Amino acid sequence: MSIQSEQDFFKFEELCKDFYLKPEETIKIDDILHQYFLNPNFLIEYKQILSFTKNSYVVAQVIRGLIKCVTSFWTSLTPNQKNDMSKSIEHHCIGLRILKDIISEFNEYIGEHLTVLQHRNISISLRDNILLDIFCISLESLNYALANSMDEKFKSIKELALDLSYSCLSFDFIKTTSIDSSEEILTVQIPSQWKSTFDENNPLELFFKIYKQYHSTKSLECILQIVSIRRSFFTTEDERVKFLASIVQYTTEILKSNIGFNEPNNHLVFSRVIERLKTNYHLNNLVTVVGYNDWISNLSTFTIDTLKNPQFSPNSIYFLLTLWAKLVSSIIYVKGDPSKTYLEKYSPIIMESFINSKIDNSYSDEEDEHLMDYEKMVEILEGIPHLGRITYQATCRQIILLFDSISSKFLNETNPTQLEVYERQCAWLVYIIGCLILGRTSINSSEEHDKIDGELSVRVFILIGYNDKKLSAESNTQYQYRTSRISLELSFIYFMQNFRRIYIGENSISSSKIYQRISELSGPTDHTSVLFSIVQKIGFNFKYWAENDEIIKKSLDMFWESVNGHSTSKMLIDNKITKDILKTHSSQVFPFLEKNSNPRNRTSLYKTIGKLLFTDENMGFFDEFIAPFDDTIKHLLNISTPEQFRTEEIKRKVIGLLRDLRGIITSANSKRSYLLFFEWIHLNFSEVLIKIINVWVDSPEVTTSLLKFISEFVFNRQSRLIFDSSSANGFIIFRDTSKILVSYASLILKANISKQDLYKFKIKGIQTSMLLFTRCLVGGYCNFGVFELYGDPSFTSAIDYIFQLCLSVSLDELMSFPKASKAYVTMLEALCLGHTLSIIQLNQQYFIHIMKSLHRCLDSQDVTMSSSSCTSIEKIITVCYYHLKKKNSQCLQAIHQNFFSNSNILYEIIDKIISIIIYEDNFNQFMFSKLLLTCIIFHQDTFTTLKQKYIHSFNSQCPEKVEKAFVQLMENTLDNLETKNKDKFTSNVSIFRKEMKLISSSTGRYL
């Protein structure tokens, strides 16, 4: 569609308005607008449109249209079209917005008007040919705005030019960032060709100048990107030193004047700039810079002011503490006298200020938010060990004075408001002690430091004991809802975890001085008694914090790590506490089994208990341990009607049973332990599970728990399912699994499920079904051919219903969920490698669906998925190739029906492989080379047709070059699939790829 008249324009304007004002027609209008945008003439028409109107709806759609049009027809643009911007302020602003949005479109894959491969290559084209010019335009616009800074009209140019500069500097230059990645790139890989522009225009100075004048956050973000530029961008050491000196000079000026820090965002971004400076440059480089002394002094003042002022973001504190930690940890690498770093002078002051700030801030209720954000808070603490241990004795004195005073007041306080303050203060001190303990290494440790650790640790252990005694005496459970109290408990867990890691078990650092000091202060103590006290504390939490999910989860994590450690497990295996748990593990012992709302915690608990059970010392307790589960299964089987079975009480019991059993079987990692569990459950295995499915198939909470349990049950972890040659156990396991799978699939296929509930009620179940079926296929404990031999439909029924499940949702829906798509491709690979003939002989609907799925995954950004697809397709075609040579092969009819009657399948596969080889970088070249040769030898005519397509699709100037590249591709290759032939072809593919890339770049072909 095109705009040729005034009437056409009014029609276009009306569409732009309706796009925003009539949401019910948005999709229909969007399709119409796309017909305008994807017409190359739109690159000329947009000027006429903008001359007619300044309507914001039209301007927004014009910008959107230019993005689509330019990204689709970039190679057709003339230089004038690429650089055209009106000299008026309004059109200047529109031009800057267009350029910024074009960069975003090139940098981020959004929409479907280009494939991933096309988008990637056109993005590289922009980077190599025009991005530097756009960056120069942004710098010119900034200078233009600064020259007219007194005129308010130029403010918008300045802001838009800063946005454009940031878009240029934050471009994914090496195209390695995942589409879904949220991780920040710490090093900016600006091309070397930009060096002259940096030398001539000095953008660093420009952005600092703008910040000083306008206090612009965006200018600081641009500075952050420049500070992050790779060091190799500067060709000589003198240039690097000069650049570093400039940063130190400019940042020192801002540190002295505190320019713009009344704006929190400025303070945060500036903190990131300072931290990134140390990330990219060594302390050795910093200390040699003129002005370092002034810089480190002002940085210390800035950090202390930040710690004292609660208005600043915790993220600012995190970046500053990280910076100081990096500086301190680098002292050992400094050449010459380390005192020239001044870190021993300033670091203790920073540490003292941090501790005092947390104590002072605890008077505010807002501190609960920081303490309850466990992950962020622990992240902030990561830098504390370096700061605290540089002058450990001074740090210890400060902590002990505060701890003794506050803990004494806390234990005697009755006023609820004041009690909350003391709880927050104690929590922070315990967290700080915990992170200081964790910071002990073989490098920074000494006997004196170990004694200090003992001084600090004994106070925490005593506080834990007094606190638990106080809590158990409370008549009500309101403490479970007090955030300050929860924070204190989480700090205890954090401390105990760190103490266990450093001073107990195989990863601990040997030291007798800490236990000697603890014994002096609190009575005889060693690592075993401390471990038991930790386990007792875990048990206390299970009882008194049953309703708090976070405390229970972290207590379970600590329990698991204690049981799973080689040395700590030996201490725990053969003792009275363990024996009591194995004999009695009901909700009376672990109240959270009934009271906690998170059923995952049940699995974690029984995984840990199972680890204790399945040892030589404790396996004799199995019958006594498993008896409660046996009673539950018998109770479920004895319920006679579906109505009686379908109650909330039974539902909770079923979910609990399945999650508990999954935890137990997860820890049965030996043949002996697995066989013990199998012999107990297999008699009632399929009967009880099928009964559960029949009644609760519409409840994803039940079916997910059931399918995940089976998935773990059939998982041949550590070869635990390899039975004796005389045993039929492997066949029994798969036969029962097939029954359950077929029952689930047949019922869920009949269910009417809405689009919004599709993942929860169906796709998640399909995903787990595929996972458990894959584990059966690759387990190696069952010969599936036996089923067909004896007329048992277990295997064929499982395959049939698995593909019915896959076909019951669209491929787009299945592939839109990463876990489901990965499970699907993994299952297809297992089937194609182990049961190729079964795949080839499937009905046409299933076979085409499989091939389309594998074709789609060939260009997946996940190399594992693309490689699996390659392997699967190659195996199918290889088997077909060899069977075609056998005139009496039974599967000839299936090959002709599935392959040759659908010739476009092979055509599309070869086409995509060639395209990936030419244009893509993120792929396994050896896998794709093998697959391409297999396809070519299997069907030469299809390859010949595609070769002609590629020859004609390039410019008329170079068809002979393309043809020559294809001739070289097949040079010295033979008509066979032997390894030697594949290796030769792989070498040819490397040459072919190189030649085709050169041809592509010379002709400007990126699509």
Swiss-Prot record:
It comes from Dictyostelium discoideum (Social amoeba). Its main location: nucleus. Keywords: Cytoplasm, mRNA transport, Nuclear pore complex, Nucleus, Protein transport, Translocation, Transport. Coiled coil: none annotated. Belongs to the exportin family. GO terms for biological process: mRNA transport; protein export from nucleus. The keyword Zinc-finger does not apply. Mediates the nuclear export of proteins (cargos) with broad substrate specificity. The gene is xpo7. It comes from the Eukaryota. GO terms for molecular function: nuclear export signal receptor activity. Transmembrane segments: none annotated. This is Exportin-7. It is found in: Nucleus; Cytoplasm; Nucleus, Nuclear pore complex. GO terms for cellular component: cytoplasm; nuclear pore; nucleus.
